[in-house]
Amino acid sequence: PLAVNFALNEGRFTTACGSLGLCRAAVDVAARYIRQRKQFKRRLFSHGIVQHLFATMLTQTRSAQLMCFSAAEYRETLHPAMINQILMAKYVASKAAVDVAGKAVQLLGANGCHADYAVE
């Protein structure tokens, strides 16, 4: 049972960190796109709703990052609350990955479903 729990926790931690990577990738693609693309003779980033969506993406990504860093620290020191911290990091990061990727698709519009942009 101990080996199984160890493997499950490592899997959860890996899932959390992978989800954080997905968040970062979606933010990077969206940032490049909204800085370059123009709509109504203005860059997308100058529109309030775009700024709001992007700020939300950054906030969710940062939250996932902090949870993953905290879980890594607990894991490294074998802190008694390590399992709970890993579970919380997995929850926050995986939820953020879904939300951030969805917002990236929204910001890219029809291009968000195109394979060249890799956010879907």
Regions from the language model: what does each represent?
Residues 6-120:
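Alpha-helical interface subdomain recognition
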Residues 1-3:
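Long, acidic (Asp/Glu-rich), low-complexity accessory segments flanking structured domains
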